[in-house]
Amino acid sequence: MILKSKNIGFGFTGSFCTFSIAKEILKELTIENNVTAIMSFNSYNLDTKFGKATDHINEIESITGNKIIYTIEDAEPIGPKKLFDILVICPCSGNTIAKLSNDIIDTPVTMAVKSHLRNSRPVVIAISTNNGLSGAAENIGRLLNRKNY
C-alpha cells in the first residue's frame, strides 16, 4: 500500500533503542504525505544513551516540517478536528500497548489514539517490546480484537 497525499500522525513512545529506525520510516512517509509527530512524555523529555531529547525533537521537527504534539491537551483535538487519515505508533512500547488495551489515557500518544479512533480511522502499531514480547501478548491480542487497530 502506497500512501500519497495523506495526513499522518506518527507517535513515538519510549522504546529509545528503535528511534533511529523509526526516524527512517518517518522520512519515507514525509516524501508524499503531511506528517505530524506525537511524542509521549518520556520520549519528549528524557535524555538516554540513545540520544538527547532536544536532538530527537529537533531532528523529528526538521524531518516533518511540523511542530511535535507533546501534551495531552494538544493531542485531544486530533479526533474532533479529524487531523489524521491514519495514525502510526512507531515505536510502540509494551507499556503503551498495555495502556491502550486497558483504556488508560495518560500520555499524549494514548490520547492521540483514543481521539483518532473516535472517527473509526486506522491505527497502525509497530510493536517494540525488547525482550518482553511474550509478556505483551495478551494486550496485543486485546487490540487485535478491536476495530481499527
What do the PLM-derived regions correspond to, one by one?
Residues 1-124, 128-149:
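A cross-family phosphate/adenosyl-ligand binding-site feature
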